[in-house]
A protein has these predicted regions:
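Charged catalytic carboxylate motif
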Residues: 9, 39, 65, 81, ...
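Amphipathic alpha-helical regulatory segments at dimerization interfaces
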Residues: 16, 32, 81-92, 96-98, ...
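Extended hydrophobic
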Residues: 162-232
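Amphipathic alpha-helical effector-binding/dimerization core
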Residues: 61-154
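Short helix-to-loop capping/linker segments positioned immediately adjacent to catalytic or ligand/cofactor-binding
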Residues: 88, 97-98, 155-160, 176-183
C-alpha cells in the first residue's frame, strides 16, 4: 500500500523545525525538505491550522498540538525507563547503556549513560534515527516484535537477501534474550541490544556497549547483556 506523500513530508517538516533551535522561514523549510515552496506552503499552512506549527514573525516553530496530545495520552507519555533507572542500570552492570525506541522504521535513542566515543555519543544525544538491521538494538527490536509487524518492516525496508539472513538470526536472538553487534556501525565498540517489555508488549531496547578489543566474541559484553535482562525482568512494568 502506498503512503500518501504528504504524511512523511509533514513529519520531515516537524523534525526540521524541532532541530533548528530557531524559527524557520518557509523558504528554509522548503530547502530542508527539498520540495517546491508552493507545495511546502500548503503543508505548513495545514500544520499551523492544526496547531503543530505556530508563526513567529516571518518564521515557524513547533506549536502546542504535540504537547496537548501528550497530555491527553497521560501515562502513555512516560518513558519505558527513566534517566534515573538507566543510571542505576549503568552502575549495576558497569558498562555504558542507552535506551532506544522504534520510531516508524528506525531506531531512535532517547538517552544514554556512560562514556562512549564522541561519534557514538552524538547519535544518542542528537536522537539520530538508525536503520534497524544496522544496529544490535534494532535487530533486538525486530526479533521480539510480533511476527506480522516484523514481516511488514522487513518487506518495506530490507532487501530479500537481508530479510532471509535476519530470519536465520531470530531464533537465536530470542533464545538468548539479546542481539549482538556485528560491528557494521559501531567499529570502536561491541554492542548488545536487550528488549524492554511492559507486560507482553515490547516497549524499547536497552543498548549495552563495551570496547572492541578484537573480532572475537566478548564474554564481558554477553555477561553484561544477561545481567541487563535480569535487571529489566525484575523491574518490568505491567
Amino acid at each position: 500500500m502506498r503512503r500518501h506523500r504528504a504524511i512523511p513530508r509533514a513529519d520531515h517538516i516537524l523534525e526540521c523545525v524541532a532541530r533548528a533551535g530557531k524559527p524557520l522561514s518557509l523558504s528554509d523549510i522548503a530547502r530542508e525538505i527539498e520540495a517546491p515552496v508552493s507545495s511546502t506552503h500548503d503543508l505548513v499552512d495545514d500544520l499551523r491550522a492544526c496547531g503543530y506549527l505556530t508563526r513567529v514573525g516571518a518564521g515557524y516553530r513547533l506549536g502546542q498540538r504535540l504537547r496537548t496530545l501528550r497530555l491527553i495520552a497521560g501515562h502513555a507519555d512516560q518513558p519505558p525507563l527513566t534517566p534515573d533507572e538507566l543510571t542505576e542500570l549503568n552502575a549495576v552492570i558497569e558498562a555504558p547503556v542507552a535506551l532506544a525506541v522504534l520510531v516508524g522504521s528506525d531506531l531512535v535513542y532517547l538517552h544514554g549513560v556512560g562514556e562512549v566515543p564522541a561519534e557514538i555519543g552524538a547519535v544518542v544525544r542528537d536522537h539520530v534515527p538508525r536503520p534497524l538491521l544496522a544496529t544490535a538494538g534494532g535487530r533486538a527490536m525486530l526479533a521480539f516484535l510480533p511476527a506480522d509487524e516484523r514481516a511488514a518492516l522487513l518487506a518495506e525496508h530490507a532487501s530479500p537477501g537481508e530479510a532471509v539472513a535476519f530470519g536465520r538470526e531470530i531464533d537465536e536472538i530470542r533464545a538468548c534474550g539479546y542481539a549482538l553487534s556485528d560491528g557494521s556501525v559501531q567499529s570502536a565498540l561491541r554492542v548488545a541490544g536487550v528488549p524492554v517489555f511492559g507486560g507482553r508488549r515490547l516497549l524499547a531496547v536497552v543498548v549495552v556497549a563495551a570496547p572492541r578489543i578484537s573480532d572475537r566474541p566478548s564474554p564481558a559484553l554477553e555477561h553484561a547483556a544477561r545481567r541487563t535482562a535480569v535487571w529489566l525482568a525484575a523491574r518490568a512494568r505491567p
